[in-house]
Amino acid sequence: DANPLIEGMIELRGVYLPVIDLPKWMGFEMSDEEREKSIIIVSDFSHNFIGMRVAHIHGVEEKNWTDIKPASNYNMNVNTNQVINHTYLENSDTLCFILDIEKLLIEAMPSMAEKIFASAKSVVDKGYQISDAVKNRKILFAEDSRAIQQYMGMVFDQLGLRYQGFDNGRLLLNYLDTLDNMDDVSMVFTDLEMPEASGHTVIKEMKANPKTRNTPIIVHTSMTSDNNSREVLDMGADHFVGKVDTDLIVATIHKIEEKYYPQTV
């Protein structure tokens, strides 16, 4: 059966992409007049091009991630499972919600979600071998999407790895500040776009701190442009992994293992 969130397909420069009814996902129905005036935003998430129908674009603003706040109890009729962060529009008290796009894609395209979570569950069947040097230490990750948190936890569970997740980069950095040393941490995964502290801030602060500067950092993000990859690697990240690629995550863990935790014979 067709997913009611998917309106159909459009062709853009020879590429066919699905169009998602964003207001419907949020629980709103556009009137005929609104639909007539609506527009489609085309976006690229991890090399997946999608169209999102919206009633109107009020404007575009560039924000520093310190201006982005985690979701909280808004005391109003809003599905907080869809809202992961918020901010305020420039020079106003207008609240602007930031949506969990990964959750949107999973719900709008369940076949893609099934493949993603099936790949996480099948990790154990592939017989990957992880050294005790990595297994005995903990992987830390910063990720504001609940759906991706669940996915990453599933991958690490299947590999038999210890891990601890944080809802944003600032919470991760605050946790690192409480540690006397990094002996119990094998590596850090970080998203790029998060409230309070972005992945760029995580890399910058970890590299500036003598305690954490030698800890491996893997950027795990939907923002998979060449510019983003080049920028974070230049900042000192070890690897850049686009969401969602289970085999690449495992391969990257192995690369970290070989470089930082070589086994002696």
Cite the ranges covered by each PLM segment.
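Acidic, metal-coordinating helix/loop segments flanking the phosphotransfer/catalytic sites
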Residues: 165-187
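Alpha4 helix (beta4-alpha4-beta5 surface) of REC/receiver domains from two-component response regulators
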Residues: 201, 223-242, 247
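Charged docking surfaces used in two-component/phosphorelay signaling
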Residues: 150-157, 170
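Hydrophobic/aromatic residues positioned on beta-strands within the core alpha/beta folds
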Residues: 218-220
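Short amphipathic alpha-helix used as the core "switch/output" element in two-component signaling
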Residues: 200-213
